[in-house]
Amino acid sequence: MSTKPDYAVTVGNVTFANDKPLALIAGPCQLESRDHAFMMAGALKEMSDRLGIGLVYKTSYDKANRTSIGGKRGLGLEKSLEIFADIRSTFGLPVLTDVHTEEQCR
């Protein structure tokens, strides 16, 4: 009996599966600024290239699950989508983020 699933998940040009090389989903917890996002994406891209592993850049545009009402939540959907598109085109990385409500999928 095999414990390997017979499926794979592909995000952009990165495939995650038991029979594929190691790949990472990595990035800052919260999208704080364009400069910070580019600094992180650049550092992660350099590391993944150097190690020869796939990378999907992941960060959240809205941290809705804060324990403090005064906690930072992020840059919001519209501004973040522009930054995500720029990260994709500048670094050639697929970008992943959280979905909080059904409406955000439309």
Task: Give the positions of each predicted feature.
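Acidic (Asp/Glu)-rich catalytic clusters
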Residues: 15-19, 45-52, 85-90
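Hydrophobic faces of well-ordered beta-strands that scaffold small-molecule active sites
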Residues: 23-27, 55-59, 95-97
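N-terminal active-site wall of soluble small-molecule enzyme domains
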Residues: 59-106
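Short glycine- and Lys/Arg-enriched binding-loop motifs that mark or flank ligand-binding interfaces
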Residues: 23, 29, 67-70
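Glycine-rich, aromatic-flanked loop segments that form ligand/cofactor-binding clefts
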Residues: 6-8, 55-64
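Glycine-rich beta-alpha loop segments
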Residues: 23, 40-51, 58
